[in-house]
Amino acid sequence: SLQKYREDIVITVDDDVIYAESMISDLVKGYDRFPYAISARRTRMILRRENGLESYKRWDGNLEEYAKVPRMDLCAIGVGGVCYPPGARSESWFEKEDMMSIAGNQDDLWLKYNEILDHIPVLYVLPTQKDSPIRIGNVGKNSLFCSNINGGNDHCASTLLERLRTAQPSQYQKWFYSLMNWNEYAAQKRAYYSNIIRTDFDKEKDM
């Protein structure tokens, strides 16, 4: 659909998930606010280490404070539903042989790689309905989800990062060094939640 309908808004979903009724309206509202960005109801914050990316397990998905503006360090997660704006999808998105050999089971990462190439940011859209998508069927120990979390995503992300460094060195430098490391990210999180606690305390004090 992303290739066939390049000049249209495209919303993608997982076919084994039951979604909240507000899913489409949430994504369309995100698009209306920032029509140049990808809108996603689930995202992860990509973090870096000194010589590479932080483990996928540490890419935080609790990102309420980052839901205001589109960012290049967010990775859209397809299971939550994703809205792609018209156009701005180059041919590299659809290189099927490369996609299958590098990211056959990690389409979220393949798409993020191409979003970096095409300078497309991601907007985290806070779901109107807080209930998470309900996956149909059981997730076993040998499932694709478990395989990706336990190293599959890390290998794919490292391969794509090296591909970016080789193909677009200046773009790689700009994007990679714009990422936060774990300590920087943790400090921002602490400051955010400390401010919430102070605000709630002040409200109670004034009552």
Regions found by a protein language model. Give the residues of each.
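Conserved catalytic core of nucleotide-sugar-dependent glycosyltransferases
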Residues: 2, 18-97
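C-terminal catalytic/acceptor-binding lobe
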Residues: 96-206
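Short, high-confidence coil segments that cap the C-terminus of an alpha-helix
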Residues: 7, 34-37, 120
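Active-site nucleotide-sugar/metal-binding loop of Leloir-type enzymes
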Residues: 1-9
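Structural element of the ATP-grasp superfamily
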Residues: 1, 84, 89, 111-115, ...
